[in-house]
């Protein structure tokens, strides 16, 4: 049960902690001035002494006090927060459930500040951040996946009065429009509970997605086919599977922000740049420029380029700035995160959200992809086999999806669209069939 002790105490200040692969460290403090709607953030002395530069492009350690009213173009959907804190908040489905959870607690909408939302998340946020004070929400109770499935179905149908507090908490943390929960599951997927901090022994942290009301029931199967194809093509993705819950399919993927070593700090491309994921027009070249600024390992460029080629060949057009992320390693260096949210999308108006080198966002050509290569520190000779590998992958995904049980009704327009796309890319790169090239030789996911 969510405590009602906050009814007459709007939250205007939260301490921000990070538990990045080790003990918790006070990163800084957020103050929200309700009268003006201005948010202020300042890094802690501990963050500065440990060179914990968590958002170096827009909120560097040496900045002093960051204030939202000094940002000329801070996106409206950031609610006055700096990007790395906005990354912790849900949008779409998760925000819908969070608003309902706060309403259930009796908190008037006019008392909900950005600090309130962070306090509601507490230690359930994506990545390594936690927030104090924490809005008291009780302990995490075990639930069977069948119960989880029934409650998700009720929430999708809009019957939130039939949904438990646990489901509202599990579903109010993740980002994205599709119905999903972040839960810790036992090895046999018999039981789940709300993710808080690190999972208990015998549990792993997963994101479980369900088909939305406007999606075919086999959407989870299609996403698994895409993720499997991505792995086969050499992209770094997390372990994924499809679960059958209450007779319906759900897509489950292991979380990369939780590891045996601890929580992993994660920052989206949009959050780093203070760029709204709702804006269209960011360029794939910008991804490479941000990688340069973060000084990621050289191996990351080939992986990131391969993802651009994969998105082009496979019609992954929901390629907005929240679907690219960076993580901090144990050595405090930046790297790109594993790829995620890879599935077929027609895109806004039939276009990619992100543009390619020559501004083409509908059906990028082979030359568009080759023009990107120098930005990713690749020669044309290195880029061509990568493009070939991803074009080959596009020819494999439909048969694989059919074997997994995706219906012909779902697959027919996808097969047709992928054929058009890859005619544009031209499968026979350089007049011959390229050999299979893995973007980088990465080890599998940590256990």
Stretches found by the model and what they are:
Residues 1-321, 325-447:
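Phosphate/dinucleotide-binding and metal-coordinating scaffold of catalytic cores
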């Amino acid at each position: 049960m969510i405590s009602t002790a906050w009814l007459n105490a709007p939250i205007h200040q939260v301490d921000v902690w990070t538990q990045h692969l080790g003990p918790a460290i006070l990163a800084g403090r957020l103050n929200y001035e309700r009268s003006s709607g201005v948010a202020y953030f300042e890094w802690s002395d501990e963050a500065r002494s440990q060179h914990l530069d968590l958002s170096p492009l827009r909120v560097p350690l040496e900045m002093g006090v960051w204030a939202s009213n000094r940002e000329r173009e801070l996106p409206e959907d950031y609610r006055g927060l700096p990007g790395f804190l906005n990354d912790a908040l849900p949008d779409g489905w998760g925000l819908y459930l969070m608003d309902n959870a706060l309403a259930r607690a009796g908190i008037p909408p006019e008392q909900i500040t950005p600090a309130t939302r962070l306090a509601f998340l507490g230690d359930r946020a994506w990545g390594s951040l936690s927030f104090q004070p924490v809005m008291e929400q009780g302990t995490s109770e075990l639930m069977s996946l069948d119960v989880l499935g029934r409650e998700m179905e009720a929430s999708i149908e809009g019957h939130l009065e039939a949904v438990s507090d646990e489901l509202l908490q599990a579903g109010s943390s993740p980002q994205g429009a599709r119905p999903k929960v972040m839960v810790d599951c036992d090895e046999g997927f018999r039981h789940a509970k709300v993710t808080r901090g690190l999972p208990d022994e015998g549990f792993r942290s997963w994101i479980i997605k369900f088909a939305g009301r406007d999606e075919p029931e086999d959407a989870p199967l299609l996403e698994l086919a895409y993720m499997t194809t991505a792995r086969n093509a050499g992209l770094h993705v997390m372990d994924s599977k499809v679960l059958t819950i209450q007779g319906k399919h759900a897509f489950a993927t292991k979380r990369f922000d939780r590891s045996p070593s601890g929580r992993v700090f994660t920052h989206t491309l949009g959050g780093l740049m203070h760029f709204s994921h709702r804006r269209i027009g960011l360029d794939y070249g910008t991804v490479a420029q941000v990688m340069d600024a973060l000084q990621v390992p050289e191996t990351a460029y080939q992986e990131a380029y391969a993802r651009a080629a994969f998105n082009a060949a496979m019609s992954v057009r929901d390629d907005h700035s929240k679907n690219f992320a960076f993580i901090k390693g144990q050595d405090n260096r930046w790297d790109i995160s594993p790829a995620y949210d890879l599935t077929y999308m027609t895109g806004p108006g039939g276009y990619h959200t992100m543009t390619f080198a020559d501004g083409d966002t509908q059906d990028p050509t082979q030359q568009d992809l080759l023009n990107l290569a120098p930005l990713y520190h690749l020669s044309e000779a290195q880029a061509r086999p990568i493009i070939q590998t991803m074009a080959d992958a596009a020819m494999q995904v439909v048969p694989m999806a059919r074997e997994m049980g995706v219906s012909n009704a779902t697959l027919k327009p996808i097969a047709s669209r992928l054929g058009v796309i890859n005619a544009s890319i031209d499968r026979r790169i350089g007049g011959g069939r390229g050999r299979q090239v893995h973007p980088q030789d990465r080890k599998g996911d940590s256990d």
